[in-house]
Swiss-Prot record:
Propeptide position ranges: 10-69, 100-103
InterPro entries: Cyclotide, Cyclotide_bracelet_CS, Cyclotide_sf
Domain of life of the organism encoding this protein: Eukaryota
Annotated signal peptide: 1-9
Taxonomic source organism: Viola biflora (Yellow wood violet)
Annotated S-S bridges: C73-C89, C77-C91, C82-C96
Entry protein name: Cyclotide vibi-K
PTMs per UniProt: This is a cyclic peptide.
Keywords for the protein's UniProt record, in alphabetical order: Disulfide bond, Knottin, Plant defense, Signal
């Protein structure tokens, strides 16, 4: 049986990997000295993003052939902006990428 990965646009929601989700949850809220409420963030993310495994996302990224955009951050941005933009991963070609030249 052949297994074909759907294009990002065919997902019902944008996707995010568990490692990126953890990084977002550990990020401090902008202009605040307190940590963001993890439960509230998880509820929002569950409504707008689908958590998928790293290998599934990596395979889909290889098929889209947008490697020149930078290093994939583990999140798509077809409908919802990148949650990882707070950690330097803006949206390019429906995927959140980090500039490989930035430190």
């Amino acid at each position: 049986a052949a297994f074909a990965l759907p294009a990002f646009a065919s997902f019902e929601k944008d996707v995010i990997t568990p490692s990126v989700l953890e990084a977002v949850l550990n990020r401090k809220a902008p202009l605040s000295n307190i940590m963001m409420e993890n439960d509230a963030i998880l509820n929002v993310i569950a409504n707008v993003k689908t958590v998928i495994s790293n290998p599934v996302l990596e395979e889909a990224l290889l098929k889209t052939n947008h490697g020149v955009n930078g290093i994939p951050c583990g999140e798509s941005c077809v409908w919802i902006p990148c949650l990882t933009s707070a950690v330097g991963c803006p949206c390019k070609s429906k995927v959140c990428y980090r500039n490989s030249l930035d430190n």
